[in-house]
């Protein structure tokens, strides 16, 4: 009687339309139920309704009121959480193929089938790439996925690398090379093979892209300054601008340096052989000659030229540092000329460090953490490595060469790829001013600092550098860590602009063309200037891709490191080891800290810090953790923690504070 009744259908539609409708994001739990988080409110999703959605789905829902509680009924999919995703293979009790998405908040198995492109026979636990083909809210069917790519077997020790590269859609292989290479540059090269160039790198480095030669400038028998010659490997001498190698390098943008090995931007026969500035081998190079006075101030204009060079000594960072620091039993230079070069470069670097400390900005010393791996990929140890004097020699030489490049390109090419940083994000300038005044001003200096740290002054390179110099002597990292959250991102631009982070009016890298595509572009522009040819402005597409690739590479490195930390600490957690750690973030849910010994990131849940969550407050302006109105922890604080749990499936470490 009521079947196909138009009045009943109309009544149902009216009832439906009268209910509140919301848009939000599904938040899964480790139970069968979930929640819908909207801009203003969070709604309960009952277990039957959760079967139609997945954590992270953006959906439309109607709100039902049952008793005194509101709950969401999912109706329409706006954007699925999963499209292309990484998964592990599993088989249900009926031996039907399924996949489990590799995501900490998604635990429901998804029915799957493999495409014809995947030839491997799949086993439980294998890693694959899948795409979601059907969704209950969109297709009126169950969740269903297709396996489109095989990554590696479950037992593959290098799964952290292969899975992470697949997640970020990066190749595990070098760029495909050519059968042979020939010199493409028509210009004559200056023969500088007689100069005693040296390279300083890690002992294992094969892709050596910079060599240095230095001599003092003298007048009437007295030293007046330094003349530094920087020779940089010249891959564009062998790579045509329209070649496939160039196109592949433009897509990759950077050599990917991963724990244990690297994936080069260029074919290995170029990066590690033909272009590498190997000891006693003549190599094509792009060379910059620059001069400074004894205070490290650049004098005159730099000279760029094409040359043939020959490194006379392959030196290693640690050996040179041990030698200069006069460590017991330290390595000694093989001859007097190399010894002289090391000492002159050392003096030059100290001069430039002092110049940058006064006229630019220096970064605070923080260690790099390196994984020492066995051949099978097991982590043997994790070393905290500080930049020693030999690293600083190379760093200062490269920085001054990159400063020269920026102004050379701006003057001659009128374009280039410039590394820029605009300091504080404009929208956070008032916050930065308020924070500085709150933490540094008092009755005596308030008027002075109001002007010194005004929004207008902080927006200028000079004012920003002055502020950084002011806070540098203050103990601890709190001020720097908090101010860092107000900064904008570094950008690649095609016009000269300041780099606030370095405190410089211009900066353009050209010293790593084997490893960075932006440096290859700048090489071509420098060569065009030398040959007095037209210079083409780098396209916005190249700048955008550089930005994307830099972000991707950092995420790849971080994701692999998180996984390796879990593997390394998994067999140690049962002993509840204690570590010193630095607070990196304060959140309502707890503290994020970094272990000083090895760099691992550990989460400390708020529930382990204080039992009553109602008495916990987080001050988002200060990035500080309060208990009963008293500030207990803030970013930059050093705390002691005990490692309590390692979750390799989610690549997370959990700890407690040791009070």
Swiss-Prot record:
Gene3D superfamilies: 2.40.50.640, Nucleic acid-binding proteins
One example GO MF annotation: RNA binding
Gene Ontology BP, a term: mRNA catabolic process
SUPFAM superfamilies to which the protein is assigned, alphabetical: Nucleic acid-binding proteins (SSF50249)
Enzyme Commission number(s): 3.1.13.1
The S1 motif domain, residue ranges: 576-658
Compartment(s) where it occurs, according to its Swiss-Prot or TrEMBL record: Cytoplasm
Disulfide cross-links: none
Claim: NADP is one of the keywords in the record: no
Keywords: Cytoplasm, Exonuclease, Hydrolase, Nuclease, RNA-binding
InterPro entries documented for this protein: CSD (IPR011129), NA-bd_OB-fold (IPR012340), RNase_B_OB_dom (IPR013223), RNase_II (IPR011804), RNase_II/R (IPR001900), RNase_II/R_CS (IPR022966), RNase_II/RNase_R (IPR004476), RNR_Ribonuclease (IPR050180)
Any one GO CC term of the record: cytosol
Start and end residues of each RNB domain: 189-531
Reaction equation(s) it catalyzes: Exonucleolytic cleavage in the 3'- to 5'-direction to yield nucleoside 5'-phosphates
Enzyme class, broadest EC rank: hydrolase
Top-level division of the source organism's lineage: Bacteria
HAMAP family: RNase_II
Primary role: Involved in mRNA degradation. Hydrolyzes single-stranded polyribonucleotides processively in the 3' to 5' direction.
Family the UniProt entry places it in: Belongs to the RNR ribonuclease family. RNase II subfamily.
Protein name (database record): Exoribonuclease 2
Species of origin: Actinobacillus succinogenes (strain ATCC 55618 / DSM 22257 / CCUG 43843 / 130Z)
Lineage: Bacteria, Pseudomonadati, Pseudomonadota, Gammaproteobacteria, Pasteurellales
